[in-house]
Structure formats: structure tokens, C-alpha cells
């Protein structure tokens, strides 16, 4: 163990760790739970420190030597392998101050170590005076939240969503000539194609992509420069423009200064809105996964209109059983995301006066939702959707037996006569044709002329 100091006194920390006194205190006082601060947030914080050092150096608020030491230490952390030095849990101060200081301490000590100094000496690099210069946890942490959210959405969620949507598009084309019976209220309706059904799924996800893309607009606004309460106290002239410039270079994202720092520190409406778009996506995915599970139910005593890929045995007692496991896993992920949405919404209400104090749990839930959805959508696309096959025999049988084909006769016979045909066929176990002819409404030839499932698919499908 080695001795570290902060404003409250001495704290003993492990000799081989780069963090300091404030991280040590947080480890002691918030030791419960297993939920570590997400690495995406740590990386975002490190990027902010790197860019702030460059900005402070440009403004001659930080000497070139210390600037270069901080930048080099930041780059070393970003290259990976030092995750053990960031041990803090999500459950800490609601401003994220302790994780901000964790990053400050590790950067300072790493810079000191690389130049032959003594860990914990704060010389020549001080975690507050140099690494945290021109910053406050209150503007740094929400900035890190937005950076982590944007990069996770664009880096993993959107590509995974596009991948699934393209797989559904491919199936819509593959199944474009497979006529089936539509269902409303879980009951038989008029004919459509399986491809039309899949095109609906694809479009639903395309709309989700648009919503998520729109939510990025507000996430591009960064709180950096607001410092403690939004007034920008202790921020040198020109710092905000320079740090934003360097962050844009570092991340490749079009970040801009927040339009109002008081709002940027005290609320997280942008993240609440963005997570809301994830909850909408979860709703859409549950609908799609549920539909596909039902369409393939059976295979002999259910709907059985599609065949699932045979990925693994489905039962420990029933041999030969194949279950829609990818569908079920996706629905569990979506359930978690919808639960996270409630947490994010409530946490978003806790912007008491000038500072929201639920920041860590907001970004933890947000990133968990993004990571779970990204993985689950890729798995669902690759191991389920891409392997779906149509059971054409079952589709044809269902179409031939459907009573709702009588809808094609409504313009010819009227609603009331068509109702009599359908009810007679149902109660007497007749075909629609048999019921129609026995009632004397049409001849067999006339019936066949008007009731053609392939002509009931909508103008675009007929063309």
C-alpha cells in the first residue's frame, strides 16, 4: 500500500494502482453492487482530458511539458490495457465527480510514473490543477455522457439495426410471391403475401432508424465550458471553441457547444429523448419477434407457416424440439430496455436547481440498452431471420380454407349475403364455394371468377 493525500487527509491505496485518494475513498464508501462505470464513459472522460490539455496549452494556461505529459498519458489509456485502474461503481455521487477524479488521478500518476516521478506526489502533474484545469465535474461528466452515447449509437447500434433491416428486406423479396392469409385481432383476414408482411417489419425498423438519427442532433451539444453551475467560472476566453475543435478531431463527430449551459448541466432531456427512441425500437422488435414466433409455431399443431433455423435442441426432455430461442432472447433484451427507459425517465426528473444528480445511472442504463440491442439485433439477424424458410404447403392450405376470401364477393353480392356465406360455411364445415352455390347466390364458375386470392393483394403486388 502507498499513501495518497486529498483535502480530507491521508488515504491508503494499493501500491500497484494508478488511482489516488479520492478514488480510494469512493471504493471504500460505495463498495456495493457489481455495476462498474462503463468503459465507454471512462474513454470519453480521457478524451476530454486530452483535448482540454491541448486547449489549455494553446491558450498558454498550461505549459507545453505538462500538456504533452497529459496527452501522452491519455493516449496510453485510450490504447487499452489499463482498465483495472478504473474500479469505481455506477453507485456514487450523482454528478459523476468521483469517476471524473478517478480519471484525473490516473492520468496524473501515469504521467508522473512515465517521467520517473513518485506516484501520489502530484508533481509535476496535479490531478486538479493540471488535468482538470478549466473544468468541473459538473460540465465534464455530462459531456462524457453525450460523447459515449453518440459513439455507441453510431458505432454499434445503427450498424446492427441496418443489418437487421437489410435481412428483413431480403426476406421480403424472397417471400414476395408467397400468398398467405393476413390476421387481425389474431383472427383470419384477407390474403396478402408473406413478403408484404416482412416489408412491414423492415419499414418499421427504417422508421426507428430515422427517430434515432434525429435524437443525435441534441446529443451533439456538449456541456463543456459551463463548469460548476453553467456560468463558465474559471474558463479562459477561447477555451470552449478550442476544446470542442479538438474533441471533433478526436472523435470524428460534429460536436458543438451547448446552446445553454444552465440547461446542459441541470437536465438530460437529450438522453431521455434518445433513450425513448431506443424504447420505441424495443417495442418494434418485440412485435416482430413475437409475430415470427407465432408464424413458425407448431410445427404441426400451430400455424407452421415458416420454418425456424435448427440452431440447437430446444428441450432437455422432448427430443427433436426446435424453439425460437433467438426470438425469446431478443424479447428479453427489449424488456430490459423498456425497464431502463423508466429508470432514465425518472432519473431525468432529478435535475434539482442547477445540476441533475442521477447522471451515472442515466448513462449506465443508456449504454446497457445500446449494447444489448446491438448484440441482440445482430444475433437475431444472423441466426434467425436469415435462416427462415417458408412452408408453402401450409400457406396454401390456410388460404384455401380461409372464410375471409368471401370479402372479394362484397362488391358483387353485398355485405349481408357475404356474411351468410361465411357463417354457413363455418357452421356446416363447407367451403366458401359450396356455401355460396347452395345458397343460390352464384354458380361455381361465377365464384371462381370473383374469388382469386392472387388478385386480392393490392395494386402494387399485382403489378
From Swiss-Prot:
Name of the protein: Fumarate hydratase class II
Pfam families for this protein: FumaraseC_C, Lyase_1
Positions that bind substrate: 95-97, 126-129, 136-138, 184, 316, 321-323
Function in brief: Involved in the TCA cycle. Catalyzes the stereospecific interconversion of fumarate to L-malate.
Site positions per UniProt: Important for catalytic activity: 328
Quaternary structure and partners: Homotetramer.
Main subcellular location: cytoplasm
Signal peptide: none
Source species: Chlamydia muridarum (strain MoPn / Nigg)
Known catalytic reactions: (S)-malate = fumarate + H2O
Comment field (misc): There are 2 substrate-binding sites: the catalytic A site, and the non-catalytic B site that may play a role in the transfer of substrate or product between the active site and the solvent. Alternatively, the B site may bind allosteric effectors.
Cellular component GO terms held in the UniProt record: cytoplasm
Domain of life: Bacteria
Alphabetical GO biological process terms: fumarate metabolic process; malate metabolic process; tricarboxylic acid cycle
Transmembrane segments annotated in the record for this chain: none
Lyase listed as a keyword: yes
Pathway recorded for this protein: Carbohydrate metabolism; tricarboxylic acid cycle; (S)-malate from fumarate: step 1/1
Gene this protein is translated from: fumC
Subcellular location: Cytoplasm
